Each structure stands twice: as structure tokens, then as C-alpha cells.
């Protein structure tokens, strides 16, 4: 079919308008499916890389955290990825808890290809592992803090620098308040940094499975001081706050081997990590959606131009006054 020059001149503005109003991602999006994920990304190659990495993280991190791989979900989790070199890294994972089951997974991730693959994706996958294992919302510090420990060292170092700044400026969160948080506070960035630091402190002293057992016992009893004493030999949240602050002030040193050896012997830990409910529509009760609204906080964190030089740690008086927020 041949077009006259007049027809081409008439069509050209229409094509320009379509290109302007359609999102670039919709023109380039490609898909890839694995056993547990359906990925939409700018290119087929990138979708494949994200999908394969998601499955690998799901397998390996579940073993590290709960002792065995997760069963296959009855329905795959859609992952929508926006990837560009200058795009701030971030992610959000949504799912529904209902009568002890979890389903309706949805995940969005964004950032540079490097940060998506080495930080955002493992962070969000860890959220799904915890949701599958605990089947209920966790305190925000315990969830976000643990998920941040699997990110790239560059991102973890950034969180530490931000923590020091928050402690200096009085934006720290008292531990009794932080342990009670089931929702994100208005000032969310200190929660991420402080939660990561405390999770790191505990994991370095007992490993990831002890951390999971501690969180599980705290959820079951709603007595975090008792759970803390059972797993870490510290029987008070105020005491934990004090020893953690001292650790931060001394540069977060790795614990000697004797520390782990002296921890209380754990009770039998169940590695059970159930999968997704095979038929969520069978429930007779309306599901309660639980969204892990990580996007706002993480985008703000990673979009910041963090200084690459390590700041000095706070002195005792600054840190002590900064952490307590009444």
C-alpha cells in the first residue's frame, strides 16, 4: 500500500501524539514466567534475569532464614520492574492474610539494573518469605530491618550513615515504642535505619534462624522482653537499647565467638514454612489485605545523594539523648 505525501504529513502528528501519551514502559515491556513469578520488565533479557534471580533468592534465602525452601505458590507473584540507570531504587510487596493463609502476591520494583538485582529484589523476596512463614504482620522494625540485611553492602553502609545522623539529631526511636510499631510512622526513615542496625546486631550474635525464632516467640507471646531473654540473654528492652547503643558508638564490632557460645540454648525450632493457600476464595471470611508499603521510604532513601565519606560516630551523650523520644 502506498501513501501520498499529504497522508503521511497528516499521520505524522498523530504518531507523535501517541508516543507522547503512551508510557515508554508500555512500548517496551516484555514478559517472562517462572514457577513462582510473572515478570514484566523493559526487555525480555532483563525480565529473564529478574525472574531467575527471584527464584534463586526465594530458594536460598528461605533456607537461610527458616531452614528449608518455600513450597511452590499456587498462583505466581506478578513482578513489575521499572529499570533505568538514574531511577531511584525502591520496591513494594502486597499480599493478603486470611485465616492463617497468605495469598494475592503483587510486587513492584524499580531502580538501576544493578540495585534492582542486588538489593531491591532480595529485600522484597525476604518480605514474602516472612509472610509465608509467620502468616501475620510483624513489627515494622523486625521486618524491614531483617530485609535490609540482605541488601548490597553499599546500601547497608548508607543505612548506617543515616542512622548516625538520626541519632545525632534526636530522631532515634525508643525501643519500647519501636517494638510496638505495626504500622509505618510518619518519620519512616529512622525506622529503616534503626531497624536494620538492631536486626544486624541480633543476627550477628545468633544467626538468622535464631532471629526468626525470636520474632516468632515474640509474636506468639506478645512479650518481647521474655522472648529476648530466651534467645539473647537480655531480659529488658531498655537494657537491649543500652547495649545496642554502646555497640553503635564503638563502631559496630563483630562479636567474639564466645558471645554466640554463651547464648541460651534454643528450644526446638520448627523450619515449617507453609506456602500460599491453594484456594483463597474458599474462605468464609473477608480477607484482610496487608500491604508492605516500602516504596515511599525506600525511594526517599535511595534517591538521596549520600556522602561517601564515613562520618564519626556519636559520643555517648549525643547518642543517649538522641535515641530516647518520649
Model-derived segments and spans:
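A generic structural signal for well-ordered alpha-helical segments enriched in polar/charged residues
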Residues: 22, 59-63, 246
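Active-site-flanking segments in enzyme catalytic domains
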Residues: 128, 145, 165-168, 300, ...
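Non-catalytic terminal regions of proteins
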Residues: 264-326
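Acidic/His/Gly-enriched intrinsically disordered linker/tail segments
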Residues: 94-104, 115-116, 133-281
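Juxtacatalytic substrate-recognition/specificity segment
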Residues: 28-139, 181, 224-227
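Hydrophobic helix-coil surface modules that form long, contiguous segments used
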Residues: 28-41, 239, 253, 267-273, ...
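Bacterial N-terminal signal peptides
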Residues: 10-23
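N-terminal secretory signal peptides that target proteins for export/translocation
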Residues: 1-8
Amino acid at each position: 500500500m502506498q501513501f501520498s505525501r499529504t497522508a503521511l504529513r497528516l499521520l505524522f502528528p498523530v504518531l507523535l501524539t501517541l508516543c507522547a501519551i503512551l508510557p515508554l514502559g508500555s512500548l517496551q515491556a516484555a514478559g517472562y514466567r517462572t514457577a513462582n513469578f510473572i515478570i514484566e520488565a523493559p526487555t525480555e533479557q532483563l525480565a529473564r534475569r529478574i525472574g531467575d534471580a527471584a527464584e534463586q533468592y526465594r530458594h536460598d534465602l528461605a533456607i537461610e532464614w527458616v531452614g528449608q525452601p518455600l513450597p511452590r505458590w499456587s498462583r505466581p507473584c506478578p513482578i513489575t520492574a521499572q529499570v533505568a540507570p538514574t531511577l531511584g531504587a525502591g520496591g513494594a510487596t502486597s499480599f493478603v492474610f486470611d485465616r492463617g493463609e497468605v495469598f494475592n502476591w503483587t510486587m513492584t520494583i524499580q531502580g538501576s539494573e544493578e540495585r534492582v538485582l542486588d538489593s531491591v529484589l532480595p529485600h522484597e523476596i525476604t518480605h514474602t518469605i516472612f509472610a509465608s512463614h509467620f502468616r501475620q504482620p510483624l513489627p515494622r522494625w523486625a521486618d524491614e530491618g531483617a530485609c535490609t540485611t540482605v541488601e548490597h553492602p553499599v546500601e547497608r553502609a548508607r543505612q548506617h550513615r543515616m542512622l548516625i545522623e538520626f541519632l545525632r539529631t534526636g530522631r532515634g526511636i525508643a525501643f519500647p515504642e519501636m517494638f510496638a510499631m505495626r504500622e509505618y510512622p510518619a518519620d519512616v526513615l529512622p525506622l529503616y535505619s534503626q531497624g536494620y542496625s538492631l536486626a544486624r546486631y541480633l543476627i550477628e550474635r545468633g544467626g538468622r534462624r535464631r532471629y526468626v525464632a525470636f520474632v516468632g516467640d515474640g509474636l506468639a507471646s506478645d512479650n518481647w522482653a521474655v522472648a529476648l531473654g530466651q534467645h539473647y540473654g537480655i531480659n529488658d528492652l531498655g537494657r537491649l537499647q543500652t547495649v545496642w547503643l554502646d555497640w553503635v558508638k564503638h563502631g559496630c564490632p563483630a562479636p567474639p565467638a564466645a558471645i554466640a557460645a554463651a547464648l541460651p540454648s534454643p528450644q526446638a525450632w520448627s523450619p515449617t514454612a507453609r506456602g500460599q493457600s491453594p484456594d483463597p476464595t474458599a474462605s468464609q471470611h473477608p480477607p484482610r489485605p496487608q500491604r508492605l508499603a516500602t516504596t515511599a521510604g525506600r525511594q526517599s532513601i535511595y534517591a538521596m545523594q549520600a556522602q561517601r565519606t564515613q562520618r564519626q560516630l556519636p559520643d555517648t551523650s549525643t547518642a543517649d539523648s538522641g535515641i530516647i523520644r518520649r
